[in-house]
């Protein structure tokens, strides 16, 4: 099968991009590619042949039909209007046409200078490229909407960050890279007709059922808000902190995008700050739901020229409804509840309070809870708590709640083990793979990618363990 590409963004949205070619790296070489995703997309294996050099994965060649552009957008960063931003080191190479008629963006990150690089060098480093590849694939296999990673190219190009590192490129795939910041850019340039063109593009290609409906814009924004609510609910249930929820890092399609200073919980800490540059804690874990709403309000403002205020407010209410409904459903599943009862939130919050006091490991606690037998007063989870009396009191109430369900242990445990992962991408696991890769050893990178494809499978090795001392509270920042 021949790959087919189109250039809808370039053809339909003039003045939203600059056309340019990638700038290859020195001695670029393919070090990893996503074999399963490549098979699903019918990408010929020959494209990954190392004897052909870095090829399209390193920006050295283009495939027929590709028409590369760097997109322009703006945004609020840490709550402050930052003005024009844009693809400062990424280039949208083209949009792959799939068999069902949909498309998939091929976006090369680290592809060199663009008109939107500002003070940057247009490069990505191996460290951050590996982190994004691991995070996006981990999220996908957890069932959370996300961009995908197709390939990583390493090089000998020196890149200066906090220390000198080496340049790399990531091929990132997504149904769309349309961001809240695209709309903000033209709204603040006082070009409302271009804001409406962006909305028309989104509806035409991603919500075509509404193209001829009079209230199409209001329906579309409601769905954007609902998708955002469901996404944030998913983050909160797995203990994921994005780290830099600027409006330019928010996807119109409700995808997790732009993995930078992210982190998954080790110990349960609702005030967890993944980004050591976030000195005020704006993007701490427990702030994510309110920040997403704030970001949606910024997007809503850009839509006021063609959506009534009442309709915008209804859509923002839809965000809250979607967030709370989806979060409640997911947390009941994590606890093994098939029905909703009035005291469920209190029971969950009591567990969270106990975990916070004890510094309990978030992922391991819920995974161990998945093995609970309602007739047994003992649990291996008990041994992880210092205050056994407090745990016993909670566990008795929990087992009593389980007995109100007409579900046997086997079925309940099966459900719980489908939503409570044994494996998440802890920062120390990513760092171990990065350290090895920077020394030229890619084995751990490949191994970790394989492990992350089965997050709901119990393991007895260190991929499911708490972090070693050196891996606790690793600091990550935006310097990618």
UniProtKB/Swiss-Prot annotation:
Q: Which domain of life is it from?
A: Bacteria
Q: Which GO molecular-function terms appear in the entry?
A: AMPylase activity; ATP binding; magnesium ion binding
List the active site: 248 (proton acceptor)
| Catalytic activity as recorded in UniProt | L-seryl-[protein] + ATP = 3-O-(5'-adenylyl)-L-seryl-[protein] + diphosphate; L-threonyl-[protein] + ATP = 3-O-(5'-adenylyl)-L-threonyl-[protein] + diphosphate; L-tyrosyl-[protein] + ATP = O-(5'-adenylyl)-L-tyrosyl-[protein] + diphosphate; L-histidyl-[protein] + UTP = N(tele)-(5'-uridylyl)-L-histidyl-[protein] + diphosphate
Q: Where does Mg(2+) bind?
A: 249, 258
Where on this chain does ATP bind? Answer: 86, 88-89, 109, 121-122, 172, 179, 258
Task: Give the Enzyme Commission number.
Answer: 2.7.7.-, 2.7.7.108
Essential cofactor(s): Mg(2+); Mn(2+)
Alphabetic keyword roster: ATP-binding, Magnesium, Manganese, Metal-binding, Nucleotide-binding, Nucleotidyltransferase, Transferase
Task: Specify the enzyme's EC class, one word.
Answer: transferase
Q: Which residues form the signal peptide?
A: none
What family is it from?
Answer: Belongs to the SELO family.
The function of this protein is: Nucleotidyltransferase involved in the post-translational modification of proteins. It can catalyze the addition of adenosine monophosphate (AMP) or uridine monophosphate (UMP) to a protein, resulting in modifications known as AMPylation and UMPylation.
Q: What is this protein called?
A: Protein nucleotidyltransferase YdiU
Question: Which organism was this protein described from?
Answer: Salmonella heidelberg (strain SL476)
């Amino acid at each position: 099968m021949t790959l087919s590409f189109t250039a809808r963004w370039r053809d339909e949205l003039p003045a939203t991009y600059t056309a340019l070619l990638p700038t290859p790296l020195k001695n670029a070489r393919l070090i990893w590619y996503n074999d399963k995703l490549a098979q699903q997309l019918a990408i010929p294996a020959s494209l990954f042949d190392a004897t052909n050099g870095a090829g399209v994965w390193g920006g050295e060649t283009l495939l027929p039909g590709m028409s590369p552009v760097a997109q322009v957008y703006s945004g609020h960063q840490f709550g402050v209007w930052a003005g024009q931003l844009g693809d400062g080191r990424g280039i949208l190479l083209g949009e792959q046409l799939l068999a069902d008629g949909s498309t998939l963006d091929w976006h090369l990150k680290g592809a060199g200078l663009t008109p939107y690089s500002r003070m940057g060098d247009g490069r990505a480093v191996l460290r951050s490229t590996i982190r994004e590849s691991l995070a996006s694939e981990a999220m996908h296999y957890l069932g959370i909407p996300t961009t995908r990673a197709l390939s990583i190219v390493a090089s000998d190009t020196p890149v200066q960050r906090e220390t000198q590192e080496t340049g790399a490129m990531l091929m990132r795939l997504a149904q769309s890279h349309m961001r809240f910041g695209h709309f903000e850019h033209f709204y603040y340039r006082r070009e409302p007709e271009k804001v409406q063109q962006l909305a028309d593009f989104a509806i035409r290609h991603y919500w075509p059922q509404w193209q001829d409906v009079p209230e199409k814009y209001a329906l579309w924004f409601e769905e954007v808000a609902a998708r955002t609510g469901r996404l944030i609910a998913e983050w909160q249930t797995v203990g994921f902190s994005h780290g830099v929820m600027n409006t330019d890092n928010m996807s119109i399609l409700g995808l997790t995008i732009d993995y930078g200073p992210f982190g998954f919980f080790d110990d349960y800490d609702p005030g967890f700050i993944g980004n050591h540059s976030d000195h005020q804690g704006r993007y701490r874990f427990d702030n994510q739901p309110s920040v997403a709403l704030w970001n949606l309000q910024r997007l809503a403002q850009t839509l006021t020229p063609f959506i009534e205020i009442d309709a915008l407010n209804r859509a923002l209410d839809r965000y809250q409804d979607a967030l709370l409904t989806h979060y409640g459903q997911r947390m009941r599943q994590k606890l093994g509840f098939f029905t909703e009862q009035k005291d469920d939130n209190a029971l969950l919050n009591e567990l969270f309070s106990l975990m916070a006091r004890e510094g309990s490991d978030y992922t391991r606690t819920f995974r161990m809870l998945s093995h609970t037998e309602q007739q047994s007063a003992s649990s291996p989870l008990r041994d992880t708590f210092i205050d056994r009396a407090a745990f016993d009191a909670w566990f008795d109430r929990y087992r009593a709640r389980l007995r109100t369900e007409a579900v046997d242990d086997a079925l309940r445990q099966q459900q719980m083990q489908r939503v409570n992962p044994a494996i998440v991408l802890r920062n120390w696991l990513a760092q171990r793979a990065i350290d090895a890769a920077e020394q030229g050893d890619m084995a751990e990178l490949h191994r970790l990618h394989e492990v992350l494809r089965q997050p709901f499978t119990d393991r007895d090795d260190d991929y499911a363990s708490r972090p070693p001392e050196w891996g606790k509270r690793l600091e990550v920042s935006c310097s990618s």
